[in-house]
């Protein structure tokens, strides 16, 4: 019992240090901190660094899906930047039943009409119950999707992406998902594979302790007659 108490005290101290370091050393492009995935956040367009109408951009965020049964059967929005016509530029949505990701982008049509084309890019089977880094990078008509620093999908858009620099970004609206989000970042330029890998290696805390918590988790189990009745992870 004494050893267990020492371990728990050390964990509390490490967690406290991680929170303090994460608070003071977050990069300027980092627009969100650790937040409940079931709660709605709004990122004002005015807070985006070098925010322009350029169709070349990069979004990066970290998320942890804890319980996939939460809102099972309903699409779960990770983030959305909707223009005045409620069209995505872009939106990122988790699947209703499968652990898939759908990225939607409104594009200009090739004809002279003002009608938009909504293009979707899908990524299947993203990891659950661990921290995941998702990066979407758009250059011209090419949309690259990175998970944990690796390029997993490239989609070719039917037209140039629409961007409304005045549109705010909403994170996990309508109940979101069971878990957490953190370290949302934005750049007004595309990202190459090396940059994407560097973003991932920087960790969701941007510190040594952040990388430590990204790599390791602790499971606490509740036993009754040596049988596990419940557990939780930190």
Q: Where are these predicted regions, by residue range?
A:
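Extracellular glycan-associated modules
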Residues: 1-234
